[in-house]
């Protein structure tokens, strides 16, 4: 189920984005980006609708996914 990111508290959203970018295997291409830059990129993807926050009822987890993959 897609959860509107605007309905998540700023602190929880920040923690979710941070967890997402810190995961091993998250690919940002050939360029090196700082943690702050990666966080800003994910925030921008959420704001423009390229990424979505997804809640799994089965696993009771929250994740960020590219909209095209969801």
UniProtKB/Swiss-Prot annotation:
Question: Which Pfam families does its entry note?
Answer: UPF0270
Family classification: Belongs to the UPF0270 family.
Matching entries from HAMAP family are given as: UPF0270 (MF_00690)
Q: What is this protein called?
A: UPF0270 protein VV3048
């Amino acid at each position: 189920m897609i959860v509107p990111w605007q309905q998540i508290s700023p602190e929880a959203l920040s923690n979710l984005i941070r967890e997402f970018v810190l995961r091993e295997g998250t690919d940002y291409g050939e360029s090196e980006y700082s943690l702050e830059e990666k966080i800003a990129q994910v925030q921008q993807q959420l704001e423009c609708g390229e990424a979505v926050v997804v809640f799994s009822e089965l696993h009771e987890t929250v994740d960020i996914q590219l909209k095209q993959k969801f």
